[in-house]
């Protein structure tokens, strides 16, 4: 069997990815299909953590722009990420995958509190860990949550699963037919070019902690496994020089 390129990964899913074609809410069939993809990777012995956004249920910034207190709006969004985490955890458990949800805001009736040592223990035992409620503080995105948790659990890579986009381009490929895809980039290039893969805080965290970032199309079955085993798909962002 091929040796995996990455042995411990954190998968970042957007909330919208759980919504299916509707674009809002949670489409259970879509979540179940994603869970199946993740299960196949877990069965290869890969240690997996997940961070899921909440944009399918709530967005804090537009709510704040409409007059809602920004802190309250962000906390509302954090609760949305917990809803997504619980649904994904249930879908994984129904496939026989041992899964734990840990939240940055304590809610003992539905999830464990986030404790780094416990999360590491779960991963070492082959359990999938889903991190919910962001980092527990307003003004921080789920991209930043993904970068922070990846650093804390010493993940080899963050897999940015994108909806219908197969990597990073120099322009929006949906609007510009001449857009060119990057196969490799450095974290510093992403920041200096202002490429919107993650927000600046998340990009800097990934760079400072030497965590690879792989951006790929999650709609293609088997792509998570392909990334883990080193197939050249999507765009890989790392601290390595482009000239290897």
Swiss-Prot record:
Primary residence: cytoplasm
Any one GO cellular component localisation term in the record: cytoplasm
Regulation of its function: Allosterically activated by GTP. Inhibited by UTP.
Binding site residues for ATP: 12-15, 55, 59, 163, 169, 172
Enzyme kind, highest EC tier: transferase
Pathway(s) per entry: Pyrimidine metabolism; CTP biosynthesis via de novo pathway; UDP from UMP (UMPK route): step 1/1
EC number, UniProt record: 2.7.4.22
GO BP terms, alphabetized: 'de novo' CTP biosynthetic process; UDP biosynthetic process
Gene3D superfamilies registered for this protein in UniProt: Acetylglutamate kinase-like
Family recorded in the similarity comment: Belongs to the UMP kinase family.
Function: Catalyzes the reversible phosphorylation of UMP to UDP.
Subunit structure: Homohexamer.
Designated name of the protein: Uridylate kinase
Organism taxonomic ancestry: Bacteria, Bacillati, Bacillota, Bacilli, Lactobacillales
Gene transcribed to yield this protein: pyrH
